[in-house]
Protein backbone atom coordinates (compact mmCIF):
# COMPACT_ATOMS: atom_id res chain seq x y z
CA UNK A 1 0.00 0.00 0.00
CA UNK A 2 1.09 3.56 -0.71
CA UNK A 3 0.99 6.48 1.73
CA UNK A 4 -2.59 7.62 2.40
CA UNK A 5 -4.05 10.50 0.43
CA UNK A 6 -6.32 12.98 2.22
CA UNK A 7 -9.60 13.67 0.41
CA UNK A 8 -11.79 16.52 1.72
CA UNK A 9 -15.36 17.39 0.77
CA UNK A 10 -17.96 19.96 1.79
CA UNK A 11 -21.49 18.64 2.23
CA UNK A 12 -23.86 20.31 -0.22
CA UNK A 13 -27.45 21.10 0.72
CA UNK A 14 -28.86 18.27 -1.39
CA UNK A 15 -26.74 15.74 0.55
CA UNK A 16 -27.82 16.91 4.01
CA UNK A 17 -29.37 14.11 6.06
CA UNK A 18 -27.48 11.37 4.22
CA UNK A 19 -25.48 8.82 6.20
CA UNK A 20 -21.81 9.70 6.12
CA UNK A 21 -20.80 6.23 4.91
CA UNK A 22 -23.14 6.55 1.94
CA UNK A 23 -21.87 10.07 1.29
CA UNK A 24 -18.25 8.90 1.24
CA UNK A 25 -19.09 5.83 -0.82
CA UNK A 26 -20.86 7.96 -3.43
CA UNK A 27 -18.14 10.57 -3.86
CA UNK A 28 -15.20 8.15 -3.80
CA UNK A 29 -16.95 5.17 -5.46
CA UNK A 30 -15.93 2.72 -2.74
CA UNK A 31 -17.27 -0.73 -1.94
CA UNK A 32 -19.19 -1.38 1.29
CA UNK A 33 -16.36 -3.63 2.51
CA UNK A 34 -13.77 -0.91 2.01
CA UNK A 35 -16.00 1.70 3.66
CA UNK A 36 -16.36 -0.57 6.68
CA UNK A 37 -12.59 -0.81 7.03
CA UNK A 38 -12.17 2.97 6.73
CA UNK A 39 -14.64 3.68 9.53
CA UNK A 40 -13.17 0.96 11.75
CA UNK A 41 -9.74 2.57 11.29
CA UNK A 42 -11.05 6.06 12.14
CA UNK A 43 -10.03 7.27 8.68
CA UNK A 44 -13.22 9.30 8.14
CA UNK A 45 -13.60 12.59 10.01
CA UNK A 46 -16.44 15.11 10.03
CA UNK A 47 -15.38 18.60 11.09
CA UNK A 48 -12.15 17.12 12.43
CA UNK A 49 -13.69 14.37 14.58
CA UNK A 50 -13.70 10.66 13.78
CA UNK A 51 -17.16 9.73 12.52
CA UNK A 52 -19.30 6.64 12.96
CA UNK A 53 -20.80 5.33 9.73
CA UNK A 54 -24.40 6.02 10.80
CA UNK A 55 -23.81 9.75 11.36
CA UNK A 56 -26.11 11.99 9.29
CA UNK A 57 -24.21 14.79 7.58
CA UNK A 58 -25.35 18.42 7.54
CA UNK A 59 -24.95 21.20 5.00
CA UNK A 60 -21.51 22.83 5.11
CA UNK A 61 -19.78 20.15 7.15
CA UNK A 62 -16.25 19.16 6.14
CA UNK A 63 -15.73 15.45 5.50
CA UNK A 64 -12.11 14.24 5.36
CA UNK A 65 -11.06 10.75 4.30
CA UNK A 66 -7.57 9.25 4.53
CA UNK A 67 -7.47 6.77 1.69
CA UNK A 68 -4.70 4.38 0.77
CA UNK A 69 -4.57 3.33 -2.86
CA UNK A 70 -5.02 -0.44 -2.98
CA UNK A 71 -2.92 -2.58 -5.26
CA UNK A 72 -5.11 -4.04 -7.97
CA UNK A 73 -3.93 -7.53 -8.72
CA UNK A 74 -5.52 -10.81 -9.60
CA UNK A 75 -4.89 -13.57 -7.05
CA UNK A 76 -5.32 -17.04 -8.57
CA UNK A 77 -7.40 -19.47 -6.49
CA UNK A 78 -6.88 -23.02 -7.72
CA UNK A 79 -9.06 -24.52 -4.97
CA UNK A 80 -12.29 -22.94 -6.24
CA UNK A 81 -14.36 -25.62 -8.07
CA UNK A 82 -14.99 -23.70 -11.30
CA UNK A 83 -17.70 -25.18 -13.55
CA UNK A 84 -17.38 -24.06 -17.18
CA UNK A 85 -20.64 -24.12 -19.17
CA UNK A 86 -19.14 -22.93 -22.47
CA UNK A 87 -15.62 -22.09 -23.60
CA UNK A 88 -14.22 -20.60 -26.80
CA UNK A 89 -11.30 -18.37 -27.77
CA UNK A 90 -13.09 -15.17 -26.72
CA UNK A 91 -15.63 -16.04 -24.01
CA UNK A 92 -16.16 -18.22 -20.97
CA UNK A 93 -19.57 -18.94 -19.45
CA UNK A 94 -19.28 -20.30 -15.91
CA UNK A 95 -21.71 -21.56 -13.28
CA UNK A 96 -21.53 -19.48 -10.10
CA UNK A 97 -22.52 -21.30 -6.89
CA UNK A 98 -24.55 -19.55 -4.20
CA UNK A 99 -22.51 -18.20 -1.31
CA UNK A 100 -19.53 -17.17 -3.43
CA UNK A 101 -18.83 -13.55 -4.51
CA UNK A 102 -18.41 -12.81 -8.20
CA UNK A 103 -15.13 -10.95 -7.69
CA UNK A 104 -12.97 -9.55 -4.86
CA UNK A 105 -13.78 -6.26 -3.18
CA UNK A 106 -10.37 -5.80 -1.57
CA UNK A 107 -6.75 -6.46 -2.39
CA UNK A 108 -5.60 -10.03 -1.77
CA UNK A 109 -9.12 -11.47 -1.38
CA UNK A 110 -9.68 -15.00 -2.71
CA UNK A 111 -12.60 -17.43 -2.85
CA UNK A 112 -14.42 -15.64 -5.67
CA UNK A 113 -15.34 -16.65 -9.21
CA UNK A 114 -12.83 -14.15 -10.59
CA UNK A 115 -9.98 -15.74 -8.61
CA UNK A 116 -10.91 -19.14 -10.02
CA UNK A 117 -11.03 -17.76 -13.56
CA UNK A 118 -7.55 -16.25 -13.27
CA UNK A 119 -6.16 -19.51 -11.88
CA UNK A 120 -7.48 -21.57 -14.78
CA UNK A 121 -7.42 -18.93 -17.53
CA UNK A 122 -4.64 -16.42 -16.68
CA UNK A 123 -5.40 -14.28 -19.72
CA UNK A 124 -8.70 -13.23 -18.09
CA UNK A 125 -6.79 -10.98 -15.68
CA UNK A 126 -5.83 -8.72 -18.57
CA UNK A 127 -9.20 -8.85 -20.30
CA UNK A 128 -11.04 -6.60 -17.83
CA UNK A 129 -9.95 -3.06 -16.96
CA UNK A 130 -9.62 -4.12 -13.32
CA UNK A 131 -7.56 -7.36 -13.24
CA UNK A 132 -9.24 -8.38 -9.99
CA UNK A 133 -12.49 -8.87 -11.94
CA UNK A 134 -10.90 -11.76 -13.83
CA UNK A 135 -12.48 -10.81 -17.13
CA UNK A 136 -16.03 -10.92 -15.75
CA UNK A 137 -18.42 -8.80 -17.80
CA UNK A 138 -21.05 -8.50 -15.02
CA UNK A 139 -21.74 -9.85 -11.54
CA UNK A 140 -24.32 -11.68 -9.44
CA UNK A 141 -25.21 -11.22 -5.77
CA UNK A 142 -23.31 -13.49 -3.38
CA UNK A 143 -26.35 -15.69 -2.65
CA UNK A 144 -27.52 -15.81 -6.28
CA UNK A 145 -26.41 -18.82 -8.31
CA UNK A 146 -26.22 -19.20 -12.06
CA UNK A 147 -24.53 -18.26 -15.29
CA UNK A 148 -21.84 -15.59 -15.58
CA UNK A 149 -19.96 -14.56 -18.72
CA UNK A 150 -16.27 -13.62 -18.76
CA UNK A 151 -13.98 -12.53 -21.57
CA UNK A 152 -10.53 -13.84 -22.47
CA UNK A 153 -9.48 -10.76 -24.45
CA UNK A 154 -9.88 -7.02 -23.89
CA UNK A 155 -11.72 -6.68 -27.22
CA UNK A 156 -14.28 -9.32 -26.23
CA UNK A 157 -14.71 -7.79 -22.76
CA UNK A 158 -15.30 -4.33 -24.23
CA UNK A 159 -17.83 -5.68 -26.74
CA UNK A 160 -19.81 -7.68 -24.18
CA UNK A 161 -19.81 -4.82 -21.68
CA UNK A 162 -21.17 -2.57 -24.42
CA UNK A 163 -23.88 -5.15 -25.18
CA UNK A 164 -24.96 -5.11 -21.53
CA UNK A 165 -25.09 -1.31 -21.62
CA UNK A 166 -27.15 -1.35 -24.82
CA UNK A 167 -29.61 -3.91 -23.37
CA UNK A 168 -28.58 -6.41 -26.04
CA UNK A 169 -28.07 -9.25 -23.53
CA UNK A 170 -31.01 -11.53 -22.68
CA UNK A 171 -30.82 -12.15 -18.91
CA UNK A 172 -33.27 -14.65 -17.38
CA UNK A 173 -33.72 -15.57 -13.72
CA UNK A 174 -35.82 -18.10 -11.83
CA UNK A 175 -37.31 -16.97 -8.52
CA UNK A 176 -39.65 -18.60 -6.02
CA UNK A 177 -41.95 -16.03 -4.43
CA UNK A 178 -44.97 -15.79 -2.15
CA UNK A 179 -47.89 -13.40 -2.33
CA UNK A 180 -50.55 -12.51 -4.91
CA UNK A 181 -49.07 -12.18 -8.38
CA UNK A 182 -50.51 -11.73 -11.87
CA UNK A 183 -49.64 -14.31 -14.51
CA UNK A 184 -47.23 -11.87 -16.13
CA UNK A 185 -46.30 -8.22 -16.10
CA UNK A 186 -43.70 -5.50 -16.51
CA UNK A 187 -42.05 -3.59 -13.66
CA UNK A 188 -40.62 -0.21 -14.60
CA UNK A 189 -39.54 1.29 -11.27
CA UNK A 190 -36.27 3.24 -10.86
CA UNK A 191 -34.14 2.17 -7.88
CA UNK A 192 -31.58 3.81 -5.64
CA UNK A 193 -29.44 2.90 -2.64
CA UNK A 194 -31.47 3.20 0.56
CA UNK A 195 -30.24 6.39 2.29
CA UNK A 196 -30.11 4.76 5.74
CA UNK A 197 -29.58 1.08 4.88
CA UNK A 198 -26.57 0.77 2.55
CA UNK A 199 -27.00 -2.97 2.08
CA UNK A 200 -30.26 -2.60 0.14
CA UNK A 201 -31.99 -0.56 -2.55
CA UNK A 202 -35.42 1.04 -2.66
CA UNK A 203 -37.79 2.58 -5.23
CA UNK A 204 -36.43 6.02 -6.04
CA UNK A 205 -38.65 9.05 -5.37
CA UNK A 206 -39.62 10.93 -8.50
CA UNK A 207 -36.84 13.31 -9.52
CA UNK A 208 -34.20 11.75 -7.24
CA UNK A 209 -30.70 12.47 -8.57
CA UNK A 210 -29.41 9.04 -7.56
CA UNK A 211 -32.23 7.13 -9.28
CA UNK A 212 -31.21 4.38 -11.69
CA UNK A 213 -33.56 3.13 -14.37
CA UNK A 214 -34.66 -0.46 -13.71
CA UNK A 215 -36.96 -2.48 -15.98
CA UNK A 216 -38.00 -6.11 -15.45
CA UNK A 217 -40.55 -8.50 -16.96
CA UNK A 218 -41.95 -11.51 -15.09
CA UNK A 219 -43.95 -14.59 -16.05
CA UNK A 220 -45.38 -17.19 -13.67
CA UNK A 221 -44.36 -20.72 -14.65
CA UNK A 222 -45.96 -22.74 -11.84
CA UNK A 223 -48.18 -22.14 -8.81
CA UNK A 224 -48.75 -24.14 -5.63
CA UNK A 225 -50.93 -22.45 -3.03
CA UNK A 226 -49.34 -19.13 -2.15
CA UNK A 227 -46.06 -20.01 -3.88
CA UNK A 228 -45.22 -19.05 -7.46
CA UNK A 229 -42.22 -20.04 -9.56
CA UNK A 230 -41.42 -17.05 -11.73
CA UNK A 231 -39.15 -16.39 -14.68
CA UNK A 232 -37.84 -12.82 -14.66
CA UNK A 233 -36.14 -11.11 -17.57
CA UNK A 234 -34.25 -7.94 -16.72
CA UNK A 235 -33.50 -5.25 -19.28
CA UNK A 236 -31.22 -3.22 -16.99
CA UNK A 237 -28.64 -4.26 -14.41
CA UNK A 238 -29.22 -2.43 -11.15
CA UNK A 239 -27.99 -3.88 -7.84
CA UNK A 240 -30.64 -6.21 -6.32
CA UNK A 241 -33.01 -5.39 -9.20
CA UNK A 242 -34.93 -8.69 -9.29
CA UNK A 243 -35.14 -8.86 -5.50
CA UNK A 244 -36.33 -5.27 -5.03
CA UNK A 245 -38.75 -5.31 -7.97
CA UNK A 246 -40.51 -8.51 -6.90
CA UNK A 247 -40.70 -7.33 -3.29
CA UNK A 248 -42.08 -4.01 -4.50
CA UNK A 249 -45.10 -5.67 -6.12
CA UNK A 250 -45.83 -7.74 -3.01
CA UNK A 251 -44.12 -10.96 -4.12
CA UNK A 252 -40.79 -11.17 -2.24
CA UNK A 253 -38.38 -14.01 -2.96
CA UNK A 254 -38.47 -16.97 -0.59
CA UNK A 255 -35.53 -16.78 1.81
CA UNK A 256 -34.73 -13.14 0.98
CA UNK A 257 -35.42 -11.70 4.41
CA UNK A 258 -33.62 -8.44 3.53
CA UNK A 259 -36.55 -7.61 1.26
CA UNK A 260 -39.31 -9.16 3.33
CA UNK A 261 -39.18 -12.69 1.94
CA UNK A 262 -40.42 -15.67 3.89
CA UNK A 263 -37.73 -17.44 5.90
CA UNK A 264 -36.54 -20.74 4.46
CA UNK A 265 -34.17 -22.22 7.07
CA UNK A 266 -33.92 -25.54 5.26
CA UNK A 267 -32.82 -23.83 2.06
CA UNK A 268 -29.85 -21.91 3.45
CA UNK A 269 -30.12 -19.16 0.82
CA UNK A 270 -32.75 -17.20 -1.07
CA UNK A 271 -34.34 -18.76 -4.15
CA UNK A 272 -32.90 -16.77 -7.05
CA UNK A 273 -31.03 -18.40 -9.91
CA UNK A 274 -29.54 -16.77 -13.02
CA UNK A 275 -30.98 -19.29 -15.42
CA UNK A 276 -29.77 -18.14 -18.84
CA UNK A 277 -27.78 -15.58 -20.82
CA UNK A 278 -28.24 -14.82 -24.50
CA UNK A 279 -25.99 -12.54 -26.52
CA UNK A 280 -24.31 -12.03 -29.87
CA UNK A 281 -20.79 -13.47 -29.91
CA UNK A 282 -18.32 -10.55 -30.08
CA UNK A 283 -16.24 -12.19 -32.84
CA UNK A 284 -18.52 -14.48 -34.86
CA UNK A 285 -21.65 -12.33 -34.30
CA UNK A 286 -23.66 -15.53 -33.99
CA UNK A 287 -26.38 -15.64 -31.32
CA UNK A 288 -25.44 -17.56 -28.19
CA UNK A 289 -27.71 -18.96 -25.49
CA UNK A 290 -26.14 -20.55 -22.40
CA UNK A 291 -28.13 -21.99 -19.51
CA UNK A 292 -27.27 -23.01 -15.96
CA UNK A 293 -28.88 -26.09 -14.39
CA UNK A 294 -31.01 -25.52 -11.33
CA UNK A 295 -28.91 -26.31 -8.21
CA UNK A 296 -29.95 -29.41 -6.23
CA UNK A 297 -31.12 -27.44 -3.18
CA UNK A 298 -33.47 -25.32 -5.31
CA UNK A 299 -34.80 -28.34 -7.18
CA UNK A 300 -35.44 -30.09 -3.86
CA UNK A 301 -37.35 -27.05 -2.57
CA UNK A 302 -39.61 -27.13 -5.62
CA UNK A 303 -40.25 -30.84 -5.16
CA UNK A 304 -41.09 -30.27 -1.50
CA UNK A 305 -43.74 -27.74 -2.51
CA UNK A 306 -45.11 -29.85 -5.35
CA UNK A 307 -43.77 -27.55 -8.06
CA UNK A 308 -42.14 -28.79 -11.26
CA UNK A 309 -38.67 -27.60 -12.17
CA UNK A 310 -38.70 -26.14 -15.68
CA UNK A 311 -36.62 -27.36 -18.61
CA UNK A 312 -33.26 -25.75 -19.03
CA UNK A 313 -34.11 -23.66 -22.08
CA UNK A 314 -36.59 -20.86 -21.23
CA UNK A 315 -39.30 -19.97 -23.66
CA UNK A 316 -38.65 -16.70 -25.51
CA UNK A 317 -40.33 -13.57 -24.18
CA UNK A 318 -41.21 -10.56 -26.25
CA UNK A 319 -38.88 -7.60 -25.82
CA UNK A 320 -41.90 -5.33 -26.01
Task: Tell what function each PLM region has.
Residues 1-320:
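RNA pseudouridine synthases
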